[in-house]
């Protein structure tokens, strides 16, 4: 059975529309995966991320495919790629909101290591992300990702992804921006710093007490070299502090990560 040229053209047109719809449906999910630490580990390759993005976008395929009939055929070659870029940007925005607790916790690890005398030049690159990171930063980062997944973080990602279409639809280029949205954006940056200080605060406090003790000891014994002995003492006491603090730390991490359910609220405040 042979197909006529008209039927072949119809099939090709349908195939192109399907590919375009699948690409637009997966673009927002792909944007999330480009920035959310859960998906940026080197063990998750580009092929896996691409397949996951397409799978996450399948429920929206019918809606996106119906909307492809609206653009003018003469300008669709320009509109569709621009829509794809816009969708990736929205995904990056969502990934930023979802990743704030994870980045805050990793920054807390960096802050703790800096306080106990382990600075960046002496640290090795994180083998999972090929980026510069301290030992405690890597540990808290991996712990945060594990708790994020175990506490239903993937469900929160999907909920934010699908709910975002009602706030910023696929075929709307420009969002609704306001001054309040800019204030909310700075509030999110403040949230990262607040998380960092709250998580690292107790550990840094005890390490600071060691510094103060060393300075007082040097005042009464000038021959005592506190600058050389302070880092070893900190590294000896540090495991004891972390074992004592571990239970409260894990509860705090879990509480912070479960706030990822408010991603849609943040996006709505930012755009409105």
From Swiss-Prot:
Coiled coil: none annotated. Its main location: membrane. Pfam families: Bac_export_1 (PF01311). The chain crosses the membrane at residues 19-39, 44-64, 88-108, 138-158, 197-217, 233-253. It is found in: Cell membrane. It is a multi-pass membrane protein. InterPro entries: T3SS_IM_R (IPR002010), T3SS_SpaR/YscT (IPR006304). Keywords: Cell membrane, Membrane, Plasmid, Transmembrane, Transmembrane helix, Transport. GO terms for biological process: protein targeting. One of its GO terms (cellular component) is plasma membrane. The keyword Transport applies. NCBIfam families: fliR_like_III. Belongs to the FliR/MopE/SpaR family. Could be involved in the secretion of an unknown factor. This is Probable translocation protein y4yN.
């Amino acid at each position: 059975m042979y197909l006529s040229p008209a039927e072949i053209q119809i099939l090709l047109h349908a195939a192109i529309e399907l590919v375009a719809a699948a690409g637009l449906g997966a673009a927002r999910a792909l944007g999330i995966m480009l920035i959310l630490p859960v998906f940026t580990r080197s063990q998750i390759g580009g092929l896996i991320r691409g397949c996951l993005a397409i799978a996450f976008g399948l429920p929206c395929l019918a809606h996106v495919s119906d909307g492809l009939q609206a653009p003018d055929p003469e300008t669709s070659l320009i509109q569709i790629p621009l829509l794809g870029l816009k969708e990736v940007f929205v995904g990056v925005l969502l990934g930023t909101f979802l990743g704030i607790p994870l980045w805050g916790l990793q920054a807390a690890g960096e802050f703790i290591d800096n306080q106990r005398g382990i600075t960046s030049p002496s640290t090795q690159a994180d083998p999972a992300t090929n980026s510069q990171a301290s030992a405690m930063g890597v540990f808290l980062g991996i712990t945060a990702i594990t708790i994020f997944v175990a506490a239903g973080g993937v469900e929160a990602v999907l909920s934010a992804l699908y709910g975002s279409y009602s706030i910023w639809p696929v075929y709307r280029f420009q969002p609704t921006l306001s001054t309040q949205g800019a204030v909310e954006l700075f509030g999110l940056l403040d949230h990262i710093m607040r998380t960092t200080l709250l998580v690292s605060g107790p550990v840094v406090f005890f390490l600071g007490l060691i510094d103060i003790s060393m300075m007082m000891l040097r005042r009464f014994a000038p021959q005592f070299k506190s600058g050389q002995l302070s880092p070893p003492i900190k590294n000896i006491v540090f495991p004891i502090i972390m074992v004592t603090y571990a239970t409260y730390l894990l509860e705090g991490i879990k509480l912070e990560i479960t706030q990822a359910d408010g991603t849609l609220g943040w996006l709505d405040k930012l755009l409105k």
